[in-house]
């Protein structure tokens, strides 16, 4: 199999809205988008560093941050959330006490900004573009400040675990029959489309890629929860094709500053004539469970956590596909990065038995694998957070894991033809190991023109799409928008 990387990138540009106070700002342009810096940094050494930073810094600081939010600023409650007898003394104790107060204040400010944002964007009437822009910028700023409060707890990173582990023993798992979904997967269509939850669309606001809005609806797989998605739509394109782009674990782009937007390049496809739907995955962002950080429950519960996440997200994607069709999209693609790719490949198999209008027409998988046992037992991030040891401590054997992996791996055939599948794999990927992604590409007969093999690792192959966007250009060609 070969790559398509030698081909020049297409640059079809759709009308871009004017800037100013009545338009959301353009994301910061990362210097990694240009050579020589991009070619020097986006290499396997970057991935080794990234795994270490994520496991030993980001996740541990996130654990402390989540405990701070759950404690309401109370030091004793905070220590209890983290399994500490008491707060440390000296400079670290002073830093943590200060951080608790700051986090509590920032959480209160953000709650107010979020409530105001929802009133403006989903309220009655017709707010001006300037009002919408101000509300979104205020929400985004307050969310970023709250997320960045993790820094206050850096002195605790060697004293706490990266996750609040809650892996059930194999005997405590639900029966397989309760987890079985469509196509041999754990994903199940949430009823007939006529019974899908009503989707509420916010007011549109001008943005750097056209116009954007938000969707929300009752999450069909998580009672009491609300599913959210951001929509980026091109200007001057009637009934554009749609891409539903799923994010990776712990990725919460909408809650960080504009610099984070340079990492997620999918919204820029609106400039090539695509509508892009960017969902907020279960247990991420607005959907964080109390006392947890974004994505933590999936990892902390081991196989059960991922089974629940895949099942819930798959049901939500079905609702979004239905919504996109009702907006006039004849072509709907599905895809994602890392966790988003693992979810998308499962949906692609499950959807083969769904009604034709709910089947995605194309698929883009970035940093994926068909072998989740390899991901769980050999993957670099799983090893760095101690997942194999935690599973063993709860009595899990590889055979136990394998039994449930049958529901989480794309063992069947996808709903779309091979020439409608685009895959991007890092040959040095050891988080979702490369061999599992290549095996899936071969089994699904992805044609060489759609398979991009790059000498990179898990993070670099995804982040480098801003500099080398040929796979996304290829997807646009397949959908007929380029």
Segment roles from a protein language model:
Residues 1-211:
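N-terminal targeting or regulatory segments adjacent to alpha/beta-hydrolase or S9 domains
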Residues 220-290:
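Short, surface-exposed "cap/lid" segments of acyl-processing enzymes
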Residues 259, 346-347, 419, 433-443, ...:
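Short alpha-helix in the alpha/beta-hydrolase fold that links the catalytic acid
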Residues 290-327:
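Alpha/beta-hydrolase active-site loop
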Residues 346-396:
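Hydrolase active-site cap/lid region
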Residues 371-372, 427-432, 458-459:
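Acidic catalytic loop of the alpha/beta-hydrolase fold
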Residues 416-417, 423-425, 429:
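Short beta-strand/loop motif that positions the catalytic acidic residue
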Residues 438-482:
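C-terminal catalytic histidine-bearing segment of alpha/beta-hydrolase fold enzymes
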């Amino acid at each position: 199999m070969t790559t398509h990387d030698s081909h020049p990138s297409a640059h079809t540009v759709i009308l871009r809205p004017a800037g100013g106070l009545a338009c959301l700002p353009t994301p910061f342009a990362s210097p990694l988008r240009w050579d020589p810096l991009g070619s020097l940094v986006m290499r396997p050494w970057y991935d080794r560093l990234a795994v270490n930073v994520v496991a030993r810094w980001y996740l541990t600081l996130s654990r402390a941050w989540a405990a701070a939010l759950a404690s309401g600023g109370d030091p004793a409650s905070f220590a209890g959330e983290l399994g500490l007898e008491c707060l440390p003394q000296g400079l670290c104790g002073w830093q943590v006490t200060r951080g608790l107060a700051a986090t509590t204040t920032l959480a209160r400010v953000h709650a107010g900004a979020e409530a105001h944002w929802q009133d403006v964007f989903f309220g009655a009437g017709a707010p001006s573009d300037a009002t919408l822009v101000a509300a979104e910028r205020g929400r985004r700023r307050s969310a970023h400040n709250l997320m960045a409060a993790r820094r206050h707890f850096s002195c605790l990173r060697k004293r706490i675990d990266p996750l609040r582990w809650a892996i059930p023993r194999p005997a405590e798992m639900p029966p397989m029959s309760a987890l079985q979904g469509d196509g041999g997967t754990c994903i199940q269509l949430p009823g007939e489309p006529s019974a899908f939850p009503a989707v509420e669309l916010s007011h549109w606001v001008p943005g750097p890629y056209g116009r954007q809005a938000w969707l929300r609806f009752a999450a069909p797989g998580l009672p009491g929860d609300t599913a959210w998605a951001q929509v980026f739509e091109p200007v001057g394109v009637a009934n554009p094709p749609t891409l539903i782009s799923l994010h990776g674990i712990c990725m919460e782009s909408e809650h960080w500053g504009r610099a984070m937007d340079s990492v997620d390049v999918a919204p820029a496809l609106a400039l090539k004539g695509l509508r892009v739907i960017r969902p907020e995955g279960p247990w991420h962002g607005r959907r964080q469970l109390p006392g947890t950080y974004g994505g933590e429950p999936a990892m902390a519960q081991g196989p059960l956590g991922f089974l629940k996440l895949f099942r819930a997200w798959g049901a939500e994607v079905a609702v979004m596909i239905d919504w996109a069709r009702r907006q006039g999209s004849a072509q709907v693609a599905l895809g994602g990065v890392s966790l988003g790719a693992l979810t998308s490949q499962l949906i692609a198999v499950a959807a083969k038995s769904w009604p034709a209008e709910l089947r995605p027409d194309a698929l883009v998988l970035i940093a994926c694998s068909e072998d989740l046992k390899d991901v769980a037992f050999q993957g670099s991030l799983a090893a760095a957070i101690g997942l194999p040891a935690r599973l063993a401590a709860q009595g899990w054997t590889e055979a136990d894991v394998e039994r449930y992996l049958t529901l989480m791996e794309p063992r069947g055939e996808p709903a779309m033809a091979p020439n409608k599948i685009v895959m991007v794999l890092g040959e040095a990927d050891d988080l979702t190991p490369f061999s599992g992604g290549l095996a899936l590409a071969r089994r699904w007969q992805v044609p060489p023109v759609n398979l991009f093999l790059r000498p990179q690792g898990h993070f670099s192959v995804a982040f480098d799409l801003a500099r080398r966007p040929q796979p996304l250009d290829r997807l646009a060609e397949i959908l007929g928008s380029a």
